[in-house]
C-alpha cells in the first residue's frame, strides 16, 4: 500500500528533481497536488521548476561530489532526473546504496547520450534504426559522412532541444556541421553521431508509462520539428492499426530494457506500416505538452503517479488537441507577454508561460494549447492564438 507523508514534516515523502525546466515544473506541480515535498535542482538560479518547489539548489549536476553531497543532505525518497547533463556514475552509486532513481540509474545513464541508447536499440534489441557512425574528431567525421552518404544528420551524443544538430546537404557544409556540433553539446565538445537521412511519412512520440500495474500507452503524438527542436505537436496522430501496433511493440521493448517506473518518450519514424526507432527519453517529452489539453491525466500527472507507485487504471483522452511552442529570438532578461486577451478569446485555447528569466539567442518560453473536434482544427486554432501573442524583449 502506497502512503504519502506531510510536506515539511519529518514523515514527508520527498522527491528531488535533477533539472528544473518547463517539463520538470509541471511534474513538480503534479507532485505537490499529491502532497509531496519537492526539491528542485538546476545549474542556474530561478529555473522554472525551482519557482514552484519547496526548496531549490543551484549546482553543476555534472559534479558528482556536489550531487552526492546534496542527495545525502536532503535524503529524498525519489531522485528524478529531468535532463541529460548529470553525473550518472554518481546516480548508479547512489542507487546501489539504496536511493530510488527514476526510472533507474541505468536508464538515465544509457539515455544521457545517444551512443548508449542507439547501441542498446540497434545492437542488443535489434530494432530498426537509421545507419549511423560515432566519431571523436574531424578526420573520422569526414570519413563517417563519406560512408553514410549525403544528406546526413549530425548530432552531439549529448544535447537537447536541437542544440548542435544539423543536416549536411552538400560537401561544403561538412566543416560547418562539425564546428556547430562541438558548440552545442551539453557537456562541451566531443563525440558525435552521424546518421543516415531517413525518408519517412511522419514522426511520432509514443509516450509509454511503466507503472505498478504494468505498461500503458498514450495515443500517438505527431509533431513538427524545426532545427532539431519541437515547434508543434498534436494528438492523436492518425496511423494504421498495424503501424500503431508495431510502434507500441517497439516502445514496450525499449522501455522494458530500460526498466523502472515512469513515463518514457519514445521517438519513432513511420514509413507506411514500418517503424524506425529514433530516440527515447526516460522522462516527460516536450512534444507531450499537448497532453495538458488532450488528456484527463497529462503525461506529467501520469509520471507523478508512476513515480509514487499509484495506480493508472485507464488513460482517457478528453479531446483531439494541439500545442505550439512559443519560441522567441533575441536578448533580454525582462520579457513581457502581451495581447493575452486576444490569445485566449477562442473556446478551448490555453497558454503556459514557463517563467524563464532570460533569452539569449532563441529559446522556448511557453506553449499554446488548443482543443477542437479534430487535430487539424486544433492546430489551426493554436496557430491563430500564437499569431496574436505579442512578446516584448
Swiss-Prot record:
GO cellular component, one term: cytosol
Binding site for N(1)-(5-phospho-beta-D-ribosyl)glycinamide: 22-23, 82, 286, 356, 363-364
UniProt binding sites for ATP: 114, 155, 160-165, 195-198, 203
Documented EC number(s): 6.3.1.21
Gene3D superfamilies: 3.40.50.20, ATP-grasp fold, A domain, ATP-grasp fold, B domain
A GO molecular-function annotation: ATP binding
Residue ranges of every copy of the ATP-grasp domain listed in the record: 119-308
Residues given in the record as Mg(2+) binding sites: 267, 279
Catalytic activity reported: N(1)-(5-phospho-beta-D-ribosyl)glycinamide + formate + ATP = N(2)-formyl-N(1)-(5-phospho-beta-D-ribosyl)glycinamide + ADP + phosphate + H(+)
GO biological process: 'de novo' IMP biosynthetic process
Enzyme class at the top of the EC tree: ligase
Record keyword Transport present: no
UniProt pathway annotation: Purine metabolism; IMP biosynthesis via de novo pathway; N(2)-formyl-N(1)-(5-phospho-D-ribosyl)glycinamide from N(1)-(5-phospho-D-ribosyl)glycinamide (formate route): step 1/1
Keywords: ATP-binding, Ligase, Magnesium, Metal-binding, Nucleotide-binding, Purine biosynthesis
Protein purpose: Involved in the de novo purine biosynthesis. Catalyzes the transfer of formate to 5-phospho-ribosyl-glycinamide (GAR), producing 5-phospho-ribosyl-N-formylglycinamide (FGAR). Formate is provided by PurU via hydrolysis of 10-formyl-tetrahydrofolate.
Membership in a protein family: Belongs to the PurK/PurT family.
Quaternary structure, from the entry: Homodimer.
Database matches in NCBIfam families: PRK09288.1, purT
Protein name (Swiss-Prot/TrEMBL): Formate-dependent phosphoribosylglycinamide formyltransferase
Top-level taxonomy: Bacteria, Pseudomonadati, Pseudomonadota, Gammaproteobacteria, Pasteurellales
Amino acid at each position: 500500500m502506497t502512503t504519502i507523508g506531510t510536506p515539511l514534516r519529518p514523515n514527508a515523502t520527498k522527491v528531488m528533481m535533477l533539472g528544473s525546466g518547463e517539463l520538470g515544473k509541471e511534474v513538480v506541480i503534479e507532485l505537490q497536488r499529491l502532497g509531496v515535498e519537492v526539491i528542485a535542482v538546476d545549474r542556474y538560479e530561478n529555473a522554472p521548476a525551482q519557482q514552484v518547489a519547496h526548496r531549490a539548489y543551484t549546482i553543476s549536476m555534472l559534479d558528482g561530489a556536489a550531487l552526492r553531497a546534496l542527495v545525502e543532505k536532503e535524503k529524498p525518497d525519489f531522485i528524478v532526473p529531468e535532463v541529460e547533463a548529470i553525473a550518472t556514475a554518481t546516480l548508479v552509486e547512489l542507487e546501489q546504496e539504496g536511493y530510488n532513481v527514476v526510472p533507474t540509474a541505468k536508464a538515465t545513464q544509457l539515455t544521457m547520450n545517444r551512443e548508449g541508447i542507439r547501441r542498446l536499440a540497434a545492437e542488443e534489441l535489434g530494432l530498426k534504426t537509421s545507419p549511423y557512425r560515432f566519431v571523436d574528431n574531424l578526420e573520422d567525421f569526414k570519413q563517417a559522412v563519406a560512408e553514410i552518404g549525403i544528406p546526413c544528420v549530425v548530432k552531439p551524443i549529448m544535447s537537447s532541444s536541437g542544440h548542435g544538430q544539423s543536416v549536411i546537404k552538400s560537401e561544403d557544409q561538412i566543416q560547418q556541421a562539425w564546428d556547430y556540433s562541438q558548440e552545442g553539446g551539453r557537456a562541451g565538445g566531443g563525440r558525435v553521431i552521424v546518421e543516415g537521412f531517413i525518408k519517412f511519412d511522419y514522426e511520432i512520440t509514443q509516450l509509454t508509462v511503466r507503472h505498478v500495474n504494468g505498461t500503458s500507452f498514450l495515443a500517438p503524438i505527431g509533431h513538427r520539428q524545426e532545427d532539431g527542436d519541437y515547434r508543434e505537436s498534436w494528438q492523436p496522430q492518425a496511423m494504421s492499426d498495424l503501424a500503431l501496433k508495431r510502434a507500441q511493440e517497439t516502445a514496450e521493448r525499449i522501455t522494458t530494457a530500460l526498466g523502472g517506473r515512469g513515463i518514457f518518450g519514445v521517438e519513432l519514424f513511420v514509413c507506411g506500416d514500418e517503424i524506425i526507432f529514433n530516440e527515447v527519453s526516460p522522462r516527460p517529452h516536450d512534444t507531450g505538452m499537448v497532453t495538458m489539453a488532450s488528456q484527463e491525466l497529462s503525461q506529467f500527472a501520469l509520471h507523478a503517479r508512476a513515480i509514487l507507485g499509484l495506480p493508472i487504471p485507464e488513460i482517457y483522452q478528453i479531446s483531439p488537441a494541439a500545442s505550439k511552442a512559443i519560441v522567441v529570438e533575441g536578448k533580454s532578461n525582462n520579457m513581457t507577454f502581451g495581447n493575452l486577451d486576444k490569445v485566449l478569446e477562442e473556446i478551448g485555447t490555453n497558454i503556459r508561460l514557463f517563467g524563464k528569466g532570460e533569452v539569449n539567442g532563441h529559446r522556448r518560453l511557453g506553449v499554446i494549447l488548443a482543443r477542437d473536434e479534430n487535430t487539424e482544427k486544433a492546430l489551426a486554432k493554436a496557430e491563430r492564438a500564437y499569431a496574436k501573442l505579442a512578446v516584448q524583449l
